[in-house]
């Protein structure tokens, strides 16, 4: 029988096991996380390149923030530890040479961007082709088994209802025998009701047992099909993990100023930490904790659950009185965020959910390392107070303002830049509706 299929309707999920209906979605989400992690790693390298041009204090702040972002993000295992090793290195380094910036942006950043473009293919309707293929594969593998599971649940419910009805019919018949006012015809009807209820019990029990047996017979094939799709997802993730390890090692080489004696020990330790990254070990961990290695409570024949249901119904009513008005929700504790020295410091895709431009230049308006006048009278840290001509710009990416003084716009929108980029990478601008606020400078381009 053809038709649309929703694996989340009509089936009770009793655990978080991979084998439960719909629980494969965590594996599918990992594909989207892989694309997101590419953005995060590019952002990480992009920020590191900027930090190469400023003082050790800013480098330390970068390391602190990114260590927290990586630890809270979806990356896991030995690759996560290898990634975090860069932050440990940054905390130990007081300053780095400016030529490192060129290698980070022109080689490593571009390599990740190109790999991401080749590995993930966007669809016109949104999402990625790789995610949809995994979703469709799991759905197809689970659909027959989920259908039989729904039949088991329905048969179990019918059987338990028949058992309950039989008990009630027997109870009525027993009570009627002690009632002298009841005529024989009424008694006969009650006896017939008992007989019919017994037949219903036998019939529903047989159907319950049959559907459960069919489910058991379908389970091996279900497991095989699900395992096959899961392994395809594992192979895709393995490519990403190995690529991340490769990129991290290349970044390490660019950062390793081996001609400076004080840096030798730092980078020797960093290389050792990265080389401990093991994709096989990470995949094995994911399999055991999020995949087929998880345990599963397979459905078993339950004879008297209807009786327990009656007791639970009463218990739930009483408990509800005590728990009315108490609601637990997921709370995003913004207070747990790491405090930043500046409200508009550069952010990661976890904080602003942003993408990054294909081109990047170190010619920043407030660059503390930019050349001054010949006399040396200009302080590179003085704020530029000269008037700025307003310029029309076009948004390259979507941006959702996170603070009251930030603008929100969509890719392709036009706005007016009112002030040049500040030292944190923000510009002041005005939307066509008159709203004035801040926005990331690298999210727009001048209109030619």
From Swiss-Prot:
GO BP of this protein: actin cytoskeleton organization; caveola assembly; cytoskeleton organization; endocytosis; negative regulation of endocytosis; plasma membrane tubulation; regulation of endocytosis
Compositional bias of kind Polar residues: 329-358
GO cellular component terms attached to this protein's record: caveola; cytoplasm; cytoskeleton; cytosol; early endosome; endosome; focal adhesion; recycling endosome membrane
Keyword Cell membrane attributed: yes
Protein name: Protein kinase C and casein kinase substrate in neurons protein 2
Modifications made to the protein after synthesis: Phosphorylated on serine residues.
UniProt superkingdom: Eukaryota
Record keyword Secreted present: no
Sequence motif NPF2, residues: 379-381
Function recorded in the entry: Regulates the morphogenesis and endocytosis of caveolae. Lipid-binding protein that is able to promote the tubulation of the phosphatidic acid-containing membranes it preferentially binds. Plays a role in intracellular vesicle-mediated transport. Involved in the endocytosis of cell-surface receptors like the EGF receptor, contributing to its internalization in the absence of EGF stimulus. Essential for endothelial organization in sprouting angiogenesis, modulates CDH5-based junctions.
SUPFAM superfamilies, A to Z: BAR/IMD domain-like, SH3-domain
Residues covered by the SH3 domain: 388-448
Gene giving rise to this polypeptide: PACSIN2
Domain called F-BAR: residue spans: 11-282
Source organism per UniProt: Gallus gallus
Positions of short motif NPF1: 367-369
Tissue: Detected in intestine, cardiac muscle, lung and brain (at protein level). Expressed in all tissues tested, including, gizzard, liver, cardiac muscle, skeletal muscle and skin.
Coiled coil, from the record: 25-274
Domain notes: The F-BAR domain forms a coiled coil and mediates membrane-binding and membrane tubulation. Autoinhibition of these functions is mediated by an interaction between the SH3 and F-BAR domains. The F-Bar domain also mediates the binding to the cell actin cytoskeleton through the interaction with CAV-1.
Location in or out of the cell: Cytoplasm; Cytoplasm, Cytoskeleton; Cytoplasmic vesicle membrane; Cell projection, Ruffle membrane
Pfam families the record matches: FCH, SH3_9
Keywords for the protein's UniProt record, in alphabetical order: Cell junction, Cell membrane, Cell projection, Coiled coil, Cytoplasm, Cytoplasmic vesicle, Cytoskeleton, Endocytosis, Endosome, Lipid-binding, Membrane, Phosphoprotein, SH3 domain
């Amino acid at each position: 029988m053809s038709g649309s299929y929703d694996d989340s309707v009509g089936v009770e999920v009793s655990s978080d096991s991979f084998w439960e209906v719909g629980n494969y979605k965590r594996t599918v989400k990992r594909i989207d996380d892989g694309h997101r992690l590419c953005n995060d790693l590019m952002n990480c390298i992009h920020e590191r390149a900027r930090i190469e041009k400023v003082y050790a204090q800013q480098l330390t702040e970068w390391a602190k923030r990114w260590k927290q972002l990586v630890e809270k993000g979806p990356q896991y295992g030995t690759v996560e530890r290898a990634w975090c090793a860069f932050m440990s290195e940054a905390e130990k380094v007081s300053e780095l040479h400016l030529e490192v910036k060129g290698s980070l942006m022109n080689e490593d950043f571009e390599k990740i961007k190109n790999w991401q473009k080749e590995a993930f293919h966007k669809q016109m309707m949104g999402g990625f082709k790789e995610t949809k293929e995994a979703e469709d594969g799991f759905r197809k593998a689970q659909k027959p088994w989920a259908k039989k599971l729904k039949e088991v649940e329905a048969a179990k419910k019918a059987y338990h209802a028949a058992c309950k009805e039989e008990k009630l019919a027997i109870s009525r018949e027993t009570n009627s025998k002690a009632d002298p006012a009841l005529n024989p015809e009424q008694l006969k009807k009650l006896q017939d009701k008992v007989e019919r209820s017994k037949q219903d019990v036998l019939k529903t029990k047989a159907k319950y047992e049959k559907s459960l047996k069919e489910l058991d017979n379908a389970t091996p094939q279900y497991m095989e099909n699900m395992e096959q799709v899961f392994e395809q997802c594992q192979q895709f993730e393995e490519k990403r993990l190995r690529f991340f390890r490769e990129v991290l090692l290349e970044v390490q080489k660019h950062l390793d100023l081996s001609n400076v004696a004080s840096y030798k020990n730092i980078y020797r330790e960093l290389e050792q930490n990265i080389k401990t990254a093991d994709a096989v070990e990470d995949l094995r961990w994911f399999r055991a904790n999020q995949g087929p290695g998880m345990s599963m409570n397979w459905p078993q024949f339950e004879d008297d659950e209807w009786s327990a249901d009656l007791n639970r119904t009463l218990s739930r009513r009483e408990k509800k009185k005590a728990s009315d008005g108490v609601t637990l929700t997921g709370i995003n504790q913004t207070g747990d965020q790491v405090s930043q020295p500046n409200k508009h410091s550069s952010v990661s895709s976890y904080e602003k959910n942003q993408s990054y431009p294909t081109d990047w230049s170190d010619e920043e308006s407030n660059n503390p390392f930019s050349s001054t006048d010949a006399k040396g009278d200009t302080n590179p840290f003085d704020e530029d107070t000269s008037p700025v001509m307003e310029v029309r710009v076009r948004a390259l990416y979507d941006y959702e303002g996170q603070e009251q003084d930030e603008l929100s716009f969509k890719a392709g929108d036009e706005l007016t830049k009112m002030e040049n980029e500040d030292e944190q990478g923000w510009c002041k601008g005005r939307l066509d509706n008159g709203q004035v606020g801040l926005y990331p400078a690298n999210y727009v381009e001048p209109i030619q």
